[in-house]
From Swiss-Prot:
One of its GO terms (molecular function) is metal ion binding. This is 3-isopropylmalate dehydratase large subunit. It is an enzyme of class 4 (lyase). GO terms for biological process: L-leucine biosynthetic process. The keyword NAD does not apply. Keywords: 4Fe-4S, Amino-acid biosynthesis, Branched-chain amino acid biosynthesis, Iron, Iron-sulfur, Leucine biosynthesis, Lyase, Metal-binding. It comes from Nitratidesulfovibrio vulgaris (strain ATCC 29579 / DSM 644 / CCUG 34227 / NCIMB 8303 / VKM B-1760 / Hildenborough) (Desulfovibrio vulgaris). Its cofactor is [4Fe-4S] cluster. The gene is leuC. It holds the Pfam family Aconitase. Its EC number is 4.2.1.33.
Length: 419
């Protein structure tokens, strides 16, 4: 049968013939990951099931990124427990401290995930790796414990929604605007347990970082995975990351889709997701006189070098409003060093930004940028649920890097084209 991207990848990892969506299959996994919040739960389940060793010490990644640098005693205990487990099991890919970054930026940078892989992680934004052509999805810690022990897990083959983006991207409109537009169109449950498959001329024009931004937020529409065909750009990215043997592939002609959507990007303008859901999407031009006290540029969604370049281009020669805290968090040490070499860090500092280490920090209301009652933030992160970044009486707007940077300058949510 003709396969969608999701079906094609899963077929490579199972001995069962995939013939239809809804089928239950057992698949071998390429990589299993967890972080400082979810790993301790997975480790507890791993031990409870009597497992003695991980299935492959080179295909488990434990990344201490959420509450690190450790913000309090409890966070330090979580990291200590995970560190000791990693050492006991001989896990190759344990990251903490100076070599650690936000997991969904770090693993692609290190070449640990790539096209055709099946990746499971105890983190909902594991779907990020779909930008590289991997079937990647978040699981609960118990299922991740099983995958760590067995090297396999089961899936219900998801139906696929194909989203086609045509046209040429205007200035200041990027991948974040595309995925927010899609989520705004279908809702936060519009792709519930569906694979989202992205294609079209505008998708082909995106770099791999932009594709990972879009795949990252597939879960915000309820998606099981967000998938891009692996093309020449993908292979170049993976080769640069040190991978070998990857091949290009796309969905089969004649593959059956549950639903097909089409968007012409040519006339698009920057958008924001307004409180308190990622589907409450409006053009920035329609969001009038909304003041912000905090701007966050970073996260597994938009903390890569291209995002920092975009933000720096807006901030260069300008100053952050005195009423705003602008927090910039490059997503990995490698990205931090590249930003330093390019002069981006100096640009941020000259503008009056706070430049911090690679951490999830404020995205989940963990630390390094918490909102007080009545405060409002615009962020390049992926969720804006009530209380997500601090107080239940605070608000979070989601945007791309250019819009966030422009808003830092003016102190109100601002279309960067108007500066």
């Amino acid at each position: 049968m003709a396969h969608t991207l999701a079906q094609k990848i899963l077929q490579r990892h199972t001995d069962e013939a995939i013939t239809d969506a809804g089928q239950i299959v057992r698949c071998r996994v390429s990589m299993v990951l967890a972080n400082d919040i979810t790993a301790p739960l997975a480790i507890k389940s791993f031990r409870a099931m009597g497992a003695k060793r991980v299935f492959d010490k080179d295909r488990v990644a434990l990344v201490m990124d959420h509450f690190t640098p450790q913000k309090d005693i409890e966070a330090a205990q979580q990291v200590k427990l995970t560190r000791e487990f990693a050492r006991e099991m001989g896990v190759t890919h344990y990251y903490e401290g100076g070599d650690c970054g936000v997991e969904h930026a770090l693993l692609p940078e290190l070449g640990l995930v790539g096209p055709g892989d099946v990746v499971v992680g105890a983190d909902s934004h594991t779907c990020t790796y779909g930008g590289l052509g991997a079937f990647a999805t978040g699981l609960g810690s118990t299922d991740v414990a099983g995958a760590m022990a067995l090297g396999e897990t089961w899936f219900k083959v998801p139906p696929t929604i194909r989203a086609t983006f045509t046209g040429t991207l205007p200035a200041y409109v990027g991948a974040k605007d595309l995925i927010l537009t899609l989520i705004g169109a279908i809702g936060v449950d519009g792709a519930l347990y569906r694979a989202l498959e992205f294609d079209g001329a505008a998708i082909e024009a995106l770099d791999v970082e932009g594709r990972m931004t879009m795949a990252n937020m597939a879960i915000e529409a309820g998606g099981k995975a967000g998938l891009f065909a692996a093309d020449a750009k993908t292979l170049t990215y993976c080769t640069t990351a040190g991978r070998t043997g990857d091949t290009a592939f796309s969905a089969d002609a004649g593959a059956v889709y549950e639903r097909e959507l089409s968007f012409d990007v040519t006339g698009m303008t920057p958008v924001v997701a307004c409180p308190h859901l990622p589907d409450n999407v409006k053009p920035v031009s329609e969001v009038k006189d909304v003041t912000v006290q905090q701007v966050v540029i970073g996260s597994c969604t938009n903390g890569r070098i291209g995002d920092l370049r975009e933000a720096a281009a807006v901030l260069r020669g300008r100053k952050v409003s005195r009423d705003v805290r602008c927090i910039v968090l490059p997503a990995t040490p490698g990205i931090w060093r590249q930003a330093l070499r390019e002069g981006l860090i100096e640009t941020f500092m000259e503008a009056g930004c706070i430049v911090g280490p690679a951490t999830c920090g404020p995205c989940l209301g963990g630390h390094m940028g918490i909102l007080a009652d009545g405060e409002r933030a615009i962020a390049t992160t992926n969720r804006n649920f009530k209380g997500r970044m601090g107080s239940l009486e605070s608000e979070v707007y989601l945007s791309g890097p250019a819009t966030a940077a422009a808003s830092a300058v003016t102190g109100v949510i601002t279309d960067p084209s108007t500066l």
